[in-house]
């Protein structure tokens, strides 16, 4: 199975990257690719429907075409993000919005998971609700949601008990 992890964190070596890399290592029976989307040039969806008239091709010529090219062969997508202000990062949300282009052609992948971390323990609800609405509407199989609260400092994920849950999720695919 090909698994693509969309890392929405702009922070190199941060807690989200640690979660993503841990997942990738534990999913050693599968082909796993981590896409660090923050440094990519990806603009917001214009909802112009150009993609619907052109087999999923977007009118915007940016790095999203690279993301879509990689996702076309994926069997599973893992959305990984820190929570900065009650939701996933703007970078990851922009990629999710641009998946609109796949609405005309369909998605190859049908399995997903969500990895979240935050500096507090009460900020995950909006991101989880959005993810559940998306997976339900698109009939994607949710393989798991892992939240790691109180990750205030960079690197604290290394000592977080939820990291074991990340490993278990990846091993049990």
Model-derived features with residue positions:
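A short, structured active-site edge motif that brings together acidic residues
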Residues: 37-40, 111, 146-150
């Amino acid at each position: 199975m090909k698994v693509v992890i969309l890392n929405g964190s702009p922070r190199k070596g941060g807690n989200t990257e640690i979660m993503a890399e841990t997942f990738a290592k534990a999913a050693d029976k599968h082909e796993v690719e981590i896409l660090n989307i923050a440094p990519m040039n990806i603009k917001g969806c214009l909802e112009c429907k150009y993609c619907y008239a052109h087999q999923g091709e977007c009118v915007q010529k940016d790095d999203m075409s690279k993301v879509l090219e990689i996702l076309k062969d994926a069997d599973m997508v893992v959305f990984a993000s820190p929570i900065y202000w009650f939701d996933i990062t703007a970078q990851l949300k922009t990629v999710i919005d641009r998946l609109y282009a796949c609405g005309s052609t369909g998605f190859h992948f049908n399995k997903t998971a969500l990895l979240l971390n935050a500096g507090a323990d009460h900020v995950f609800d909006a991101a989880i609700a959005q993810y559940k609405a998306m997976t339900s509407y698109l009939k994607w199989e949710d393989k798991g949601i892992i939240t790691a609260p109180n990750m205030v400092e960079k690197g604290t994920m290394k000592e977080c008990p939820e990291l074991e849950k990340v490993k278990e999720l990846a091993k049990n695919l």
